[in-house]
């Protein structure tokens, strides 16, 4: 739970300068102590370094998120590459609270067909649709490597890319809409088969079964083929 108290690891009112790449950031001792012990507090706690500029060769764009986090703001992450970069730097800077916030994020992130996808963990945790690709990938890519890096005490985390899939982002979004409760909009038998194939790929087994229970029927009153859904597949 949230604890507003801040340990006095560094003098709270003293300002410290950190240069990340080609950008400088100034943070108070209170901000740096709010997520500690860390790379920063370990450095500035040494008397010889207390008035020095700390130079670090990492991404200033990613550090903007860390800067906001240390100041006490909620950090909103919109894309998979930023999520993965922030996770790597939370490990690099030894920020325990940020690491836990990322691992306990409410969202899964991935690059699907070249498009960044952000989807609610709660949405993908429904009965019959979990475990799935995202639950397994999230644990293996983020949680497991986090534990390994911590245990091995590496100087910096290895290069890491967000989960990337050569699948259709359009079909994935349609599956997500169905998981949100929307009725399937089946345009053709081929479209239905594609949706079933994608649902099975992601291990959305209950959704795949629902799609398999959709049948085409001929309506003699309209003279057209229509989509019908078995009553057994409607929750």
Range-by-range predicted roles:
Residues 68-74, 78-101, 175-183, 187-219:
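Hydrophobic, ordered structural segments
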Residues 1-67, 72-165:
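BTB/POZ (also called T1 in voltage-gated K+ channels) oligomerization domain detector
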Residues 116-197, 212-235:
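BTB/POZ-protein C-terminal extensions
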